[in-house]
Curated annotation (Swiss-Prot):
SUPFAM superfamilies linked: PCD-like
Similarity-based family: Belongs to the pterin-4-alpha-carbinolamine dehydratase family.
Residue sites binding substrate per the record: 61-63, 78-81
InterPro entries documented for this protein: PCD_sf, Pterin_deHydtase
Any single GO CC term annotated in Swiss-Prot or TrEMBL for this entry: cytoplasm
Taxonomic lineage from the root: Eukaryota, Metazoa, Chordata, Craniata, Vertebrata
Alphabetized UniProt keyword annotations: Acetylation, Activator, Cytoplasm, Lyase, Nucleus, Tetrahydrobiopterin biosynthesis, Transcription, Transcription regulation
GO molecular function per UniProt: 4-alpha-hydroxytetrahydrobiopterin dehydratase activity
PANTHER family tied to this protein: PTERIN-4-ALPHA-CARBINOLAMINE DEHYDRATASE (PTHR12599:SF13)
Subunit record text: Homotetramer and homodimer.
Protein role: Involved in tetrahydrobiopterin biosynthesis. Seems to both prevent the formation of 7-pterins and accelerate the formation of quinonoid-BH2. Coactivator for HNF1A-dependent transcription. Regulates the dimerization of homeodomain protein HNF1A and enhances its transcriptional activity. Also acts as a coactivator for HNF1B-dependent transcription.
The protein's name in its UniProt record: Pterin-4-alpha-carbinolamine dehydratase
Catalytic activity: (4aS,6R)-4a-hydroxy-L-erythro-5,6,7,8-tetrahydrobiopterin = (6R)-L-erythro-6,7-dihydrobiopterin + H2O
BP term (GO), one: tetrahydrobiopterin biosynthetic process
Length: 104
């Protein structure tokens, strides 16, 4: 299990968030979290994506909030331990991007 998470400070956010914004991640209004909606060819690809992300999330002991309808997967990331964005969210979002790219 990873060490205690800390909430990203302003400098860390300036360094880490632009790359995620560039690929479609947005900040949740009124909450210290990021989200993105992914679209796939069909339900099987969406479910395969979720399965790969779930396996990694379990390894990291850091789980996304997500919602799936057919070929769409909406993901929100925030770290409950520090009540906001942490490096764990950035790392998981980066992994999620790699998985999504491999399925397109």
């Amino acid at each position: 299990m990873a060490g205690k998470a800390h909430r990203l400070n302003a400098e860390e956010r300036e360094q880490l968030l632009p790359n995620l914004r560039a690929v479609g991640w947005n900040e949740v209004e009124g909450r210290d979290a990021i989200f993105k909606e992914f679209h796939f060819k069909d339900f099987n690809r969406a479910f395969g994506f979720m399965t790969r992300v779930a396996l990694q999330a379990e390894k990291l002991d850091h789980h996304p909030e997500w919602f799936n309808v057919y070929n769409k997967v909406h993901i929100t990331l925030s770290t409950h331990e520090c009540t906001g964005l942490s490096e764990r969210d950035i790392n998981l979002a980066s992994f999620i991007e790699q998985v999504a790219a491999s399925l397109s």
